[in-house]
Amino acid sequence: MDRALELHLIEELLGLREAKTHFLDQAIEFNSVDHYQSEIIFNEERESIFARLPAVAAHVCEIRNPGDFVKRDVAGRSIIVTRDAEGKARAFFNVCRHRGTQLVSEESGCKQRFTCPYHAWTYANSGELVSAPHLESGFPELDMAKYSLKALQCDERFGFIWVVVNSGLTVDFEQYFAPIADEAEAVSYTHLTLPTSYAV
């Protein structure tokens, strides 16, 4: 952590202690219950904040090995987060490109390929459409490269896998995380060693 910021936060906490309060505000304010219960506000926040900014989709330990995957709901969208054969974390909408059926129903597992339960279109865990029944007779003109899973921007940082579920946006992860990078790295969310005993 930046030393000046660290000292500022310590001084702020000591000031609260001296003032015998837990609050930085001069007066306590109450928000309308509607702010917490409104479906309209919820949908606006989900689309304008959570769908547009990086969100934690998984911890790295959840998809440690190639083929590991988890299914998540991020900002109201079902996604698959997986690790491909090269060890790269990837994220896709959990939707078959043929008829829009949900590809994965399990919460987690290990698969090199995802097969749609509806018409058996099959995708590599790197997103490419690799096979479909009756391709030559039913879809002779199909360009398989155009029917890969819809990929999401995905990045691995601070022990987490982050995704942006608005596929029309590009977020500069380096710039986005710059203000907290030093502190987040110092905490080390990737590895945690605890002095414990499992003896019973």
Sequence positions of predicted segments:
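A contiguous, surface-exposed recognition patch within enzymatic or periplasmic domains that forms
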Residues: 182-187, 197
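Single conserved hydrophobic/aromatic residue that forms the stacking wall/gate
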Residues: 191-200
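Core active-site phosphate/anionic-ligand binding loop and the adjoining beta-turn-alpha structural block
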Residues: 158, 185-192
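N-terminal pre-ligand scaffold of iron-sulfur
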Residues: 1-106, 152-155
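Rieske [2Fe-2S] iron-sulfur-binding domain
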Residues: 62-167, 171-181
